[in-house]
C-alpha cells in the first residue's frame, strides 16, 4: 500500500521511498526514511496536498509524491504521551572547560582581536533570524513561515568588533536540492568561516540534528545553540545538554532567542572555539559494529575517505564531508574533486558493495545511518514533552483555517477584512488626518515665505515643488503602515504556510506550486522582497514564472495613486474600488500564467514539500520592527527620490527651452517631453501631456506619479476633474495597476533572472499588457454607455 491511500487519522510505517534524483534525496533528508512512523493528519480542502506528522513535526506532500512511498503496519493513531523521566541536572561546563565533550585542536590559534567570521546555520523556521538580531543588534525581519531569509546577511557580534556573523538561508541538509542549500554549502567551502553557530529547534530536535551531523563533517569549529528551550521546559520536556555534548563532540548551549536567554554564553563559547581552532571531537557517526548494514556503511565511508583524501585536500574540501556526499551520489562534489576514471570506477564498486550488504540504495543508506544515530542520541538525552500548547492551538485553528469547507471562505474573509480596514476605515481615516496636518504646515510655510519677501521663483520651488510633491506622497503613509501591519501579522502567525497548503492544487492548474503563493502575497507589500523570496523555490521553472507574475500583485507603492483617484472620483466606494483593483491584478496574473504554462514554461510545477509551523502569537517587537522599517523606507524615499523628482519636475514645468520662466506650463520643457509620449495614451482616454509625464516618472518610484501630478497642478488637485471622468479615471487606475514595476523591482528581476534582457522584457511586457487591458476596459465601458 502507498502513503497516498492512508486514511486520515491513521498511522503507518514507511517501507520504501520511490522516485529518483534530488527530490527523492530531499524526501529522505526530511526524515521520510524506511522504518519511520507517519500519521495522516489531513488533506487540503481540494483533496491535495496532504499533511503528515513524523518525527514530531508536520510536513506537506502531494498525493502524486506520496504514491511513491510504500507503507505497512497501518493502525490507529497512538495518543500515548511520552513518559516523563527524571534526569539528573549536571552543571553546564564553562568556556574553555570542554566538560565531557572532547575537541580536536588544530593548533591554528588566533591572537585576541584578530578577525573572526561565523556562519549562522539552521533549519527553516527555527529562530535563526531572531538569534541573528540578538547576536548583532540588527533589525532583520522575522516571520513564522519557511524561507524568511532568502539572502545572506552580515552583522558584527555585539561587544566583539572583531567578530562577524553571516545569517544564511534556512536549509534542511547540505544536499544540493535548493538554491539555499547550494548557497550555504558554497559559503562553508569557499569562504571558510572560522566558526559555525548551528541553531537547532529544541522542540523538534530529531529533525534538526540531521543538518547538525553534516555540519560537523565540515570539520570547522562549531557550537550548537539549542533554541526554544523555554518551550521544552514549559511543556514538561527535558534535554540533557551535557550528554548531548558528549555524543556530538561540540559545545551545546541552551538558549531562547526570543527571550534573549543564554545569548551571552553562546557568544563566549563561539568566540572561544573559533579563536582556539577547536574542531568537533568526532566526525564519525557510523556504527562500526552495527547491524542492518551499519557496519557496511562504516567501512564504505572510510574506504572512500582513503581513496579521495589527496583530491579533497587539493580541492580544499573536508575529506569526511566529501566522502559522505560522494556515497550519496553528489555530482557537484564529484566534479570538484576531479577523480580520474579508475578512481571513479573504484568508488562505484565500493558503493555497490555497500548497497548489496545493506539491502538499501546509497541515498537511503546514508539517511538511515544519520537518523539511527540521532534516534540513539535522543533516546539517551531527550525526554519529549507532552503536546505543546502551541501545537494544540494550531490543531484547533486549522479545523477552520484549513478545513475542507471553511479554508477558502476564511482566506477570502481575512483578505477582505484587511483591505477594508486598510482602505476604508483605519488607513484612509489616518491618511485624511495627516493630509490636513500637511496642508496646515504648507499654508504656514507659504505665508511665512511671502512675509519674508523671498524671490518668487524660489518661493514657487519650495511651495509648489517640494512641499506639494513630498507632502502629497507623505499623506498616504498611514495606508502603507496599516497594510504592512496586517501582512506582518499574517507572516508572524504562521498563516502564510497554511495559505500555500490550501492554494497548492489551485495554483497547480496555472502551472505553479503552492510555495509560489508566499512570494506573491509578499508582493502586495513590495515587489523587491517578493522577487527575492522566489529563491526558496527549488525549480528554476517555478522561480522564473513566479518572478514574472509577482508584478501583477499590486505593491504598496501604488497605494498613493489609488487613494488620490478614488478620493477624487469614488469617495463613497474607495475601499470597493481598491479591492477591485487588487483582484483585477490577480485575475490578469492568472491569465498570463496560463499563457506561460502553455508556451514558454511548459512542464510540471515543483513538488510541494513544506514544513507547517505551529501558529504563534505575533511578536509585538517583530511587527513593530517591520512597520518601523517600512515607514522609514517610505519616508526616506519621500525625502530622496520623491524630493529630487519633485525638484526636477518643478524645474522642467517652470522653464522653457531658453530657460525663461513660462506663463503657461504648456510652453515648458516638461510639456515638450510629455508630448512625445502623450499620443500613446490617447486611445485610453487620457492623452494629456501631464498624465503621460507622471506615468514616466512613475518608473523611478510609483509614488512619483502623485508628486508629479501635484507639482504640475500647482497643488490644486481639483484639476483632475477637468482631465478625467470617473470612467476614464478607472481606466487610468487599471493601467497604473499593471504597467512596469519601479526601477528597484526591475533591478531585482535582473539580479534573480541573471540577464538585463530579462529585465527589459519584463518592462515591455508589463507596459504592453497594461495598455491592452486598459484599452479593453475602455472599449467595454464605451459599449455599455460610459
Placement of each model-derived feature along the sequence:
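Canonical P-loop GTPase G-domain recognition
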Residues: 232-285
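Conserved G1/Walker A P-loop phosphate-binding module
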Residues: 92-173
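Juxtamembrane inter-helical linkers in multi-pass membrane proteins
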Residues: 440-444, 497-527, 602-626, 670-672
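Hydrophobic alpha-helical transmembrane segments
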Residues: 367, 396-444, 449, 456, ...
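Extended helical scaffolds that flank P-loop GTPase cores
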Residues: 276, 283-455, 659-661, 665-670
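Conserved C-terminal guanine-recognition region of P-loop GTPase G domains, centered on the G4
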Residues: 160, 185-252, 561
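Extended, low-charge hydrophobic alpha-helical regions
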Residues: 357, 364-365, 384, 425-466, ...
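Juxtamembrane and boundary regions of transmembrane helices in multi-pass small-molecule transporters
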Residues: 522, 534-542, 550-614, 722-786
